[in-house]
C-alpha cells in the first residue's frame, strides 16, 4: 500500500473528496496520513479506519516520506511547498485541486473520462504532477466530450451561469445571508396577499442598492442579481476565468491545433451547480440524432436530455443535478446561422466532476 498524504481535506472540495472516497472504499487501498496547516497534533479523522494525529503540512521531511500527496489547500500552499518539495529531490506523485500548476509543462490536467490517453502517456513518460481542471472546462468536456472525441468541433462560444460554490464556502454563506436579508425586509408584505408586488420589488431594490447587504466576498450583491465577471481582469478584456476556457480545454485534449473557445463567465445565485449555454460551430453538418448518440456514448455520466420543455425544466437544472455525478446536456438543436451551428445547454455539480472527482479517480489509478 502507498502512503498518501491529504492536505486541505476539511475544506469544501476536500470534504466532498473525503465523502466520495468513503463511498467508493478508496481508503481500503491506501495508508492515509492527514495533515493540517493550523491544528497539528490534534486527532486525525478516522476515514479508512486509521487512527493517529494531524501532521504539520509545512514539514518537508514528513511530506517527503509520502508516495502521493493530495492537496485541496489552495494555490498559496502549492506555490510555497511544491517547489521546495521537488527541489529537495522528492519524486512522489502530487495531485492538486488548485490552479497554480495547471499550465506547467510537467503537469497534466486530469479528467480521465476525457483524456485517459493523455494521462497514460504522461505516466509512461515520468509525469508525476496531476492537477484538476477549471470547473466549467471539466464540466463542459464531460457533457460535450463526444463531439470533441470525434473531431467535430470547429469552435465554441459559451455563456456560463456559475454557482456561488465556485468562489468557496464563504461565498455560499454570503449568498444565503443576502437572500435572508432580502426576504426578511419584505416578509410582512409577502404574507399579505393584497400588497402590491411592485412596492415589494422597490423595497428589495432599495435594500440591494443601499450598501447594507453583506458583500465581503462577492464585492456586490448576488441575491436577486448576477455578476458578469469572474476572476481577474486581463489586458485583452477577458476575465481570467474566460481565458481558462481555451487554454485548459486544449491542454486537457492535447490538441495539435488550437480549438477556439471563448465567451462570458457570469456568477449567478445557484449554490453548487454550474450551467453553460453553448453555441458550437461543427466542422460539418451532423444530424441531431447523431449528435445525441455521440454525446450519450462518450462516458457513463453524460446524459442527453431531449429538447422538450417539460423534460428540460425537470432534468436540466441545478436543482435536479446538485449532488449527483450526472452531467446532462440538452437544448440540442440547429441554429438559424446554418446547419453546422449547434446549441447546447449543460449542467454539472461544480464540487464533483468540477473539482473532487477527477482527483479521486487519479488517486485510484496511482494507488
Swiss-Prot record:
Disulfide bridge map:
none
Which residues are noted in the entry as substrate-binding? 162, 241, 267
Under SUPFAM superfamilies, the record lists: Glyceraldehyde-3-phosphate dehydrogenase-like, C-terminal domain (SSF55347), NAD(P)-binding Rossmann-fold domains (SSF51735)
Q: In which pathway does it act?
A: Amino-acid biosynthesis; L-lysine biosynthesis via DAP pathway; (S)-tetrahydrodipicolinate from L-aspartate: step 2/4; Amino-acid biosynthesis; L-methionine biosynthesis via de novo pathway; L-homoserine from L-aspartate: step 2/3; Amino-acid biosynthesis; L-threonine biosynthesis; L-threonine from L-aspartate: step 2/5
Its GO biological process terms?
'de novo' L-methionine biosynthetic process; diaminopimelate biosynthetic process; isoleucine biosynthetic process; lysine biosynthetic process via diaminopimelate; threonine biosynthetic process
**Source organism superkingdom:** Bacteria
What does the record give as EC number?
1.2.1.11
Q: Which Gene3D superfamilies match?
A: Dihydrodipicolinate Reductase, domain 2 (3.30.360.10), NAD(P)-binding Rossmann-like Domain (3.40.50.720)
InterPro entries with a match to the protein in the record = Asp-semialdehyde_DH_CS, Asp_ADH_gamma-type, Asp_semialdehyde_DH, NAD(P)-bd_dom_sf, Semialdehyde_DH_NAD-bd, Semialdhyde_DH_dimer_dom
Keywords tagged on the record: Amino-acid biosynthesis, Diaminopimelate biosynthesis, Lysine biosynthesis, Methionine biosynthesis, NADP, Oxidoreductase, Threonine biosynthesis
Supply the SMART domains for this chain.
Answer: Semialdhyde_dh
Q: Which residues bind NADP(+)?
A: 10-13, 37-38, 73, 165-166, 193, 350
Molecular function GO terms recorded: aspartate-semialdehyde dehydrogenase activity; NAD binding; NADP binding; protein dimerization activity
One Pfam family recorded for the sequence: Semialdhyde_dhC
Report residues binding phosphate.
102, 244
Q: Please list the residues that carry the modification S-cysteinyl cysteine.
A: 135
Please state what class of enzyme this protein is.
oxidoreductase
Role noted for this protein = Catalyzes the NADPH-dependent formation of L-aspartate-semialdehyde (L-ASA) by the reductive dephosphorylation of L-aspartyl-4-phosphate.
| Similarity section | Belongs to the aspartate-semialdehyde dehydrogenase family.
By its UniProt entry, which NCBIfam families does this protein fall under? asd_gamma (TIGR01745), PRK06598.1 (NF005144)
| Quaternary context | Homodimer.
- Output this protein's name: Aspartate-semialdehyde dehydrogenase
Amino acid at each position: 500500500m502507498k502512503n498518501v498524504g491529504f492536505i486541505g481535506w476539511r475544506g469544501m472540495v476536500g470534504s466532498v473528496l473525503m465523502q466520495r472516497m468513503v463511498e467508493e472504499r478508496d481508503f481500503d487501498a491506501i495508508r492515509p496520513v492527514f495533515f493540517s496547516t493550523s491544528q497539528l497534533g490534534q486527532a486525525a479523522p478516522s476515514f479508512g479506519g486509521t487512527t493517529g494525529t494531524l501532521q504539520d503540512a509545512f514539514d518537508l521531511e514528513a511530506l517527503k516520506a509520502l508516495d502521493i500527496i493530495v492537496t485541496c489547500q489552495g494555490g498559496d500552499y502549492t506555490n510555497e511547498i511544491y517547489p521546495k518539495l521537488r527541489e529537495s529531490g522528492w519524486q512522489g506523485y502530487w495531485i492538486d485541486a488548485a490552479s497554480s500548476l495547471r499550465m506547467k509543462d510537467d503537469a497534466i490536467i486530469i479528467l480521465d473520462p476525457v483524456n485517459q490517453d493523455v494521462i497514460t502517456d504522461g505516466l509512461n513518460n515520468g509525469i508525476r504532477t496531476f492537477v484538476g481542471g477549471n470547473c466549467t472546462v471539466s464540466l463542459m468536456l464531460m457533457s460535450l466530450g463526444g463531439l470533441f472525441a470525434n473531431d467535430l468541433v470547429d469552435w465554441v462560444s459559451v455563456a456560463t451561469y456559475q454557482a456561488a460554490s465556485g468562489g468557496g464556502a464563504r461565498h455560499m454563506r454570503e449568498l444565503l445571508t443576502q437572500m435572508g436579508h432580502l426576504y426578511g425586509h419584505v416578509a410582512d408584505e409577502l404574507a399579505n396577499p393584497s400588497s402590491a408586488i411592485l412596492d415589494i420589488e422597490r423595497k428589495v431594490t432599495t435594500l440591494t442598492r443601499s450598501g447594507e447587504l453583506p458583500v465581503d466576498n462577492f464585492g456586490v450583491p448576488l441575491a436577486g442579481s448576477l455578476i458578469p465577471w469572474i476572476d481577474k481582469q486581463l489586458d485583452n478584456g477577458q476575465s481570467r476565468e474566460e481565458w481558462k476556457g481555451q487554454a485548459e480545454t486544449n491542454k486537457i485534449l492535447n490538441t495539435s491545433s488550437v480549438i477556439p473557445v471563448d465567451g462570458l463567465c457570469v456568477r449567478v445565485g445557484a449554490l453548487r451547480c454550474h450551467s453553460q449555454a453553448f453555441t458550437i460551430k461543427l466542422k460539418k453538418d451532423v444530424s441531431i440524432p447523431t449528435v445525441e448518440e455521440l454525446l450519450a456514448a462518450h462516458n457513463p455520466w453524460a446524459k442527453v436530455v431531449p429538447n422538450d420543455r417539460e423534460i428540460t425544466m425537470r432534468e436540466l437544472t441545478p436543482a435536479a443535478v446538485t449532488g449527483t455525478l450526472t452531467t446532462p446536456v440538452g437544448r440540442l438543436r440547429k441554429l438559424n446561422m446554418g446547419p453546422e451551428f449547434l446549441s447546447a445547454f449543460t449542467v454539472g455539480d461544480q464540487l464533483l466532476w468540477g473539482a473532487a472527482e477527477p482527483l479521486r479517480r487519479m488517486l485510484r489509478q496511482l494507488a
